[in-house]
């Protein structure tokens, strides 16, 4: 390997690592959550106490603009749609169409299980009633995140949807980016707020009273669940209000891992790593390969490509950061082990037998099979969802989908005979846990005196419970 490597090397060859050692070897970004918590708590408290007045103050402080309208007027959304570039509109509408098709297939069906005559347990899937969807701003504009949040929520049957997204510094009126507003209009979402950051999360969690006539008495009602990605402050705010409302996940910086063997195209690998690094200086780009030759060629391709991409400075910082690297392995099995330990948000598999590799992948937010399924396809147009678990949480968490916006609720339906068959056993169980009233409430339906423990078995026999 050259001493002038673009990305650092993590060499696992010849090493037999324990599970803990493998997890420790994976490249990760420093999150700084303690510092973020100290900054976010006062924001949450202020929005809870002062509502829209606090939201305007924070917009002025962080976004350098004081919006007249925190809730985007309907005419502004219509104007944004009318002004939208036809080619961009066509792309957005195609993305929506594909995402709707996939989301429709995800809607779970109710089912029931008959355990005996008169003994049924059913399961219903009920939509969350009101959801707050956060769409980030910052270094880029993300109309795609509008689609990825709204479409599965609509497919789930969510009754009330609200979107919060930061005001655009390009708009003197303090409204969000026009492409985001146009996307909301295409999707039929009319409750949109020009509010970003931790203060948007506070608004969703606690609601916000109005402070100016155009706000009304109540600017925003509280929601039941908050979804959508954001920066460290948004993620921290979501974590801090979790329990007051539901959240989808606490997202960290975006990331990609690529499992590649000697047959992969190094130029494409380099382009894919750069594509993810473009998001943020803390974005993670990781190549996992058993081919030192591929690793060398990717390093050389990066040296050629990075200076030529528009956001070269950001990409350079990301690729050279501690959260990125090239992991060298002894073979495909160790590459798979490393990928499962890293648990990437996006995992590309560019190997001779991708299906054999994918069959052994346990941990990934989404898997992109083969060289013609790059991550940006999933970001925009594949029909899959791009709101995915990050920072290793794909070991236990899943990406956004219809299920995110629904709750399974069991319905227990026993008739008299169904309960009678189990009454004595329920009572025995309850007594073993020293919760006799549990058993007594069941026995009360069949015997006269469930509190007379001296005659309980006799009463059960007379009632046909034994």
Language model features with spans:
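Short acidic-hydrophobic, aromatic-tinged amphipathic segments that line or gate anion-handling sites
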Residues: 6-15, 191-196, 326-331
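General beta-strand structural signal in soluble alpha/beta enzymes
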Residues: 111-115, 133, 163-165, 191-197, ...
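A conserved active-site cap/scaffold subdomain adjacent to cofactor or substrate pockets
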Residues: 249-322, 326
């Amino acid at each position: 390997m050259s001493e002038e490597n673009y990305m650092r090397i993590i060499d696992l060859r010849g090493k037999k690592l324990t599970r803990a050692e493998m997890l420790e070897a994976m490249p990760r970004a420093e999150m700084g959550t303690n510092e973020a918590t100290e900054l976010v708590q006062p924001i949450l408290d202020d929005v809870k106490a002062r509502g829209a007045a606090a939201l305007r103050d924070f917009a002025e402080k962080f976004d350098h603009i004081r919006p007249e309208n925190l809730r985007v007027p309907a005419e502004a959304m219509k104007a944004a749609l009318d002004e939208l570039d036809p080619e961009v509109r066509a792309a957005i509408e195609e993305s929506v169409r594909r995402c709707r098709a996939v989301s429709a297939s995800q809607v779970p069906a109710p089912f029931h299980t008959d355990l005996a005559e008169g003994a049924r347990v059913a399961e219903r899937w009920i939509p969350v009633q009101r959801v707050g969807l956060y769409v980030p701003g910052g270094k880029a504009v993300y109309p795609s995140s509008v689609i990825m949040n709204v479409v599965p929520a609509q497919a789930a049957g969510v009754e009330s949807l609200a979107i919060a997204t930061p005001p655009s510094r390009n708009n003197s009126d303090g409204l969000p980016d026009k492409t985001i507003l146009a996307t909301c209009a295409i999707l039929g979402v009319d409750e949109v707020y020009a509010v970003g950051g931790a203060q948007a999360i506070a608004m969703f969690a606690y609601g916000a009273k109005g402070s100016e006539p155009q706000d009304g008495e109540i600017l925003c009602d509280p929601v039941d669940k908050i979804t959508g990605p954001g920066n460290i402050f948004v993620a921290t705010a979501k974590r801090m209000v979790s329990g007051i409302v539901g959240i989808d996940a606490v997202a960290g910086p975006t990331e990609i891992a690529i499992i590649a063997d000697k047959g992969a195209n190094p130029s494409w690998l380099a382009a894919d790593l750069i594509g993810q690094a473009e998001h943020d200086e803390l974005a993670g780009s990781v190549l996992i390969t058993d081919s030192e030759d591929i690793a060398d060629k990717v390093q050389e391709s990066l040296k050629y490509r990075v200076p030529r991409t528009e956001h070269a400075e950001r990409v350079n910082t990301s690729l050279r950061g501690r959260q990125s690297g090239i992991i060298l392995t002894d073979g495909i099995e160790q590459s798979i082990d490393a990928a499962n330990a890293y648990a990437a948000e996006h995992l590309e598999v560019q190997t001779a037998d991708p299906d054999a590799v994918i069959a052994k992948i346990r941990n990934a937010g989404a898997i992109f099979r083969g060289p013609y399924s790059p991550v940006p396809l999933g970001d925009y147009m594949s029909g899959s969802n791009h709101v995915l678990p990050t920072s290793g949480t794909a070991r236990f968490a899943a990406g956004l989908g219809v299920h995110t916006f629904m709750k399974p609720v069991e319905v227990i339906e026993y008739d008299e005979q169904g309960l009678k068959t189990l009454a004595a056993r329920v009572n025995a169980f309850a007594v073993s846990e020293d919760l006799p009233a549990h058993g007594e409430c069941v026995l009360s339906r069949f015997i006269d005196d469930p509190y007379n423990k001296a005659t309980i078995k006799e009463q059960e026999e007379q009632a046909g419970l034994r």
